[in-house]
């Protein structure tokens, strides 16, 4: 078994499904309600139903893996500017080396893949490059598909095409936003697909049930979790929707 195969098996060890809590938002937004103390939040959820966490390099290094028992740890490996920037970036660049990911013993690395912008080809080249670099050290890559035109992030054609393109360029798993015909995303993608959360949604449990019925193998939610009034209850409901 290769390093990639071993890590992919670990990602999907819980019945072939993956439930990630995404706490990487401050890389873009800085201060965020609910993420005032990420290390303590992670530790408080070590016995919850979540399978693991998505963290930026700085927080990743501050959280001892032993403190979160057997949870999966995914390293955020790309950057596209902050909320204070004057333009939306058409390309997200790798900022965490494969050596760093290996040193931290990351189970996978998450990178953003922006499609349809003025630097579309550059974005493709960057994704292919980082996939090659991480694969050299046996580390899987999760590509999160983003539309350069943010209003199209829920467009079926954009999501399905972006997922397939990312897989063709080397991604081992896709993180994709909800779209009406989600089965088109999963049926055309040769690698596992998990659902991206996005803004808080009162009916998000129903959305999870729908995408799982259409082939999604997991979810990676942030604000729906860390800004929930009852985090444990929300996690339990989402886990139930994912696994039943």
Feature names for model-found ranges:
Residues 223-229:
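A short, acidic, flexible beta-alpha connecting loop/helix-capping segment that sits on the rim
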């Amino acid at each position: 078994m290769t390093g990639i195969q071993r890590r992919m098996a670990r990602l999907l060890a819980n019945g072939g499904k993956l439930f990630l809590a995404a706490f990487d938002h401050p890389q873009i937004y800085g201060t965020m309600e609910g993420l005032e103390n990420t290390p303590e939040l992670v530790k408080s959820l070590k016995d919850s139903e979540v399978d693991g966490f998505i963290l930026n390099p700085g927080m990743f290094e501050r959280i001892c893996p032993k403190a979160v028992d057997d949870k999966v740890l995914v390293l955020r490996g790309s950057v596209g500017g902050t909320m204070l920037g004057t333009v939306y970036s058409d390309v997200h660049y790798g900022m965490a080396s494969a050596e760093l990911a290996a040193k931290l013993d990351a189970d996978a690395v998450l990178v953003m893949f922006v499609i349809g912008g003025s630097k579309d080809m550059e974005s493709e080249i960057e994704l292919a490059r980082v996939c090659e670099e991480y694969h050299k050290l046996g580390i899987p890559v999760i590509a999160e598909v983003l539309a350069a035109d943010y209003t199209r992030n829920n467009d079926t054609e954009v999501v399905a095409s972006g997922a397939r393109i990312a897989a063709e360029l080397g991604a081992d798993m896709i993180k994709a936003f909800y779209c009406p015909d989600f089965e088109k995303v999963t049926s055309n993608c040769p690698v596992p697909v998990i659902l991206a959360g996005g803004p808080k949604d009162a009916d998000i449990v129903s959305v999870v049930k729908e995408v799982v019925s259409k082939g999604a193998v997991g979810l990676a939610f942030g604000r729906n979790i860390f800004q929930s009034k009852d985090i444990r209850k929300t996690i339990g409901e989402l886990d139930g929707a994912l696994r039943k």
